[in-house]
Amino acid sequence: MRIAREEIFGPVLVVIAYGDEHEAVRIANDSEYGLSGGVWSADEAHALAVARRVRTGTVTVNGAPVAFGGPFGGFKASGIGREYGAVDLGSYTEYKTITSDVPMGWRHRFDR
């Protein structure tokens, strides 16, 4: 489907039926672009496993906000490098940011 292969900027919602998870990942990855994507699931561990298979520079899980301290940039034709984060580790590395719906204040547990 053409709309699933193009890089669209704007308020657009695309809904495409798929048979199983493998087909959903195939549809998501069947594009020359890979800036951002999202995975929704009641099972967060499963959603994180699927997010690792989606070839985009940023993947949100269950609508989590973007991690502004993480590297920003895309894969494939969407990738012209990375901004933010410590990402100058090599030109052959594809960095991915995965965000999840972690409760606010989660960082404080490490301050002790």
Question: What are the residue ranges of the model-derived segments?
Answer:
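Conserved C-terminal structural/oligomerization subdomain of aldehyde/semialdehyde dehydrogenase
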Residues: M1-R112
